[in-house]
Amino acid sequence: MDHIHHLLSSHGFTRTRLAKSKPIVVHAIAGSGKSTVIRKILSDLPNARAYTLGKPDPYSLSNPTIKAFAQFKRGTLDILDEYGQLPFADLDSSFEFIFTDPYQAPTDNLFEPHYTLEITYRFGPNTCNLLNQAFQSNITSLVTQDNISFGSPYLVDPVGTILAFQPDTYLILCLHQAPFFKVSEVIGYQWPTVTLYLACKISEIPEEERHLLFIGLTRHTESLLILGPDAFDSSP
């Protein structure tokens, strides 16, 4: 256990004042490297097993991997990633460490954290500025550059991977036979360039759906195009 606490500290996670208790709760934003830390734990501690409610690792013969939550079996040192996608009542008591991005989860599913990290290696300062304005967060980036642009879905063509937020956008994309993912389907995924379709202004999205908005705004590593009903009113 002490080794895991040391790993978290050495990777930049900040220890809160919350007393140690089971499970140890780790909150880290998208692209912070929490999956890297979990894989390091698996590599260093042979009895550790990790599962996720997001995207599992590909199968590997040589390295321990983060498995899908559906494969969960109780062990001696169980770790869960993206725990925020799971209601409290469904969280198994055997998990020693649980991780999530709190902005990507319904607030009702969140515990108070023992460790936090709001530094990302995925996207750049423009995305951080948008997120901090929309979510009153304090996210910073070690990436020096990224691009965010806005446009009308009727005037601008999508680029890269297409993500859709809200049913109205699903219908439009289906009518145009454009391949897309719903934002609820892409936790743990990332692409260089993403187009996100919105049905309303960011500021008008209901509180209960804002964790899905955060997912949609953080899947890119280089460029994000936001297409909404009013190109000049899609920003917060």
UniProtKB/Swiss-Prot annotation:
Task: Specify where it is mainly localized.
Answer: host cell
Q: Where in the cell is it found?
A: Host cytoplasm
Q: Does the keyword Membrane apply?
A: no
- Report the InterPro entries cross-referenced here: (+)RNA_virus_helicase_core_dom (IPR027351), P-loop_NTPase (IPR027417)
Instruction: Pinpoint the (+)RNA virus helicase ATP-binding domain residues.
Output: 1-117
Kindly give the Pfam families that the UniProt entry links to this protein: Viral_helicase1
Keywords from UniProt, A to Z, are:
Host cytoplasm, Host-virus interaction, Inhibition of host innate immune response by virus, RNA-binding, Suppressor of RNA silencing, Transport, Viral immunoevasion, Viral movement protein
What the protein does comes down to: Transports viral genome to neighboring plant cells directly through plasmosdesmata, without any budding. The movement protein allows efficient cell to cell propagation, by bypassing the host cell wall barrier. Increases plasmodesma size exclusion limit. Acts as a suppressor of RNA-mediated gene silencing, also known as post-transcriptional gene silencing (PTGS), a mechanism of plant viral defense that limits the accumulation of viral RNAs.
In the record, the note on similarity to other proteins reads:
Belongs to the Tymovirales TGBp1 protein family.
> Could you share any additional remarks the record makes about this protein?
TGBp1, TGBp2 and TGBp3 seem to act together for cell-to-cell propagation. TGBp1 is the main movement protein that physically cross the plasmodesma with the viral genome. TGBp2 and TGBp3 would facilitate TGBp1 function.
- Name of the featured protein: Movement and silencing protein TGBp1
Q: What is the lineage of its organism?
A: Viruses, Riboviria, Orthornavirae, Kitrinoviricota, Alsuviricetes
